[in-house]
Amino acid sequence: MISIEKFEIFGREIWIAVFFEEKIDGVTFSLDGCEYLMERINSLKALLERRNVSVNLAEEKSDYPKIVYNVLVGDIENQDALRFLSFRGVTPFEKKVYEVLTKKVKRGSVITYGELAKMLSTSPRAVGNAMKRNPYPIIVPCHRVVLKSGLGDYTPKREYKQFLLEIEGVKGWTS
């Protein structure tokens, strides 16, 4: 099923969509309206299906979008929201990366790909690949992983990464 809800944050609309069965299978969002959200939903659906996670597009009301929003605004700690994630279709390595990132890199801070890789005894490229395939943005805070030389990329838009970090009060990485 999918649950979609619109919220407001820092004077902007944010649309949050969550695929779920018993737990969250995937999250996507848009700061650019409902039409762009539909593009993001299709991208997430394709990612989940490539990972053999069955996706049902039937809309059903759920508390999950509000939970994601509460993580976004800091009312729920990221690590406390891990229990809502199914981790279906996620590799054991990706799950480890997501859990370490979520538990170790707190709201208001960032970590470089290299630093996170060192914590996990792996390569920065492997960490980057896991971040790119993260089906749980906002809850698993891949936006907090930055390049040594600057902000770095973010799917769907670099501007979204900057906005998420600004919401969290991160200074110096958002300009």
Curated annotation (Swiss-Prot):
It catalyses: a 6-O-methyl-2'-deoxyguanosine in DNA + L-cysteinyl-[protein] = S-methyl-L-cysteinyl-[protein] + a 2'-deoxyguanosine in DNA; a 4-O-methyl-thymidine in DNA + L-cysteinyl-[protein] = a thymidine in DNA + S-methyl-L-cysteinyl-[protein]. Involved in the cellular defense against the biological effects of O6-methylguanine (O6-MeG) and O4-methylthymine (O4-MeT) in DNA. Repairs the methylated nucleobase in DNA by stoichiometrically transferring the methyl group to a cysteine residue in the enzyme. This is a suicide reaction: the enzyme is irreversibly inactivated. GO terms for cellular component: cytoplasm. NCBIfam families: DNA_protcyst_Mta_Thcoc (NF041132), ogt (TIGR00589), PRK03887.1 (NF003022). The lineage of its organism: Archaea, Methanobacteriati, Methanobacteriota, Thermococci, Thermococcales. One of its GO terms (biological process) is DNA alkylation repair. GO terms for molecular function: methylated-DNA-[protein]-cysteine S-methyltransferase activity. It is found in: Cytoplasm. Its main location: cytoplasm. Keywords: Cytoplasm, DNA damage, DNA repair, Methyltransferase, Transferase. The active site is at 142 (nucleophile). This is Methylated-DNA--protein-cysteine methyltransferase. It comes from Thermococcus barophilus (strain DSM 11836 / MP). Belongs to the MGMT family. This enzyme catalyzes only one turnover and therefore is not strictly catalytic. According to one definition, an enzyme is a biocatalyst that acts repeatedly and over many reaction cycles. Its EC number is 2.1.1.63. InterPro entries: DNA_protcyst_Mta_Thcoc, MethylDNA_cys_MeTrfase_AS, MethylDNA_cys_MeTrfase_DNA-bd, MethylDNA_cys_MeTrfase_DNAb, MGMT, MGMT_N, MGMT_N_sf, WH-like_DNA-bd_sf. HAMAP family: OGT. It is an enzyme of class 2 (transferase).
